[in-house]
């Protein structure tokens, strides 16, 4: 994967992580309604951010 492809992937992952963050935030504002969704939404947010951080590291390594 070249640097431009990595940047495009990073942009998509950033959008996904941002949406996951907003979903978690929205859920927190609705509490205690839908409290049972906390683990599911938090896990999605965690996984999105793991992928984002890994992609950032890979891009930095490719640019070095």
Please report, for each region that a protein language model flagged, where it lies by residue.
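N-terminal acidic leader/helix
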Residues: 1-28
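Short, charge-rich amphipathic interface segments used for partner binding and complex assembly
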Residues: 29-64
């Amino acid at each position: 994967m070249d640097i431009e492809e990595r940047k495009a992937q990073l942009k998509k992952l950033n959008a996904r992580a941002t949406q996951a963050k907003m979903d978690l935030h929205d859920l927190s504002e609705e509490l205690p309604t839908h409290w049972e969704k906390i683990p599911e939404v938090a896990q999605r947010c965690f996984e999105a951010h793991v992928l984002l951080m890994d992609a950032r590291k890979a891009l930095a390594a490719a640019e070095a």
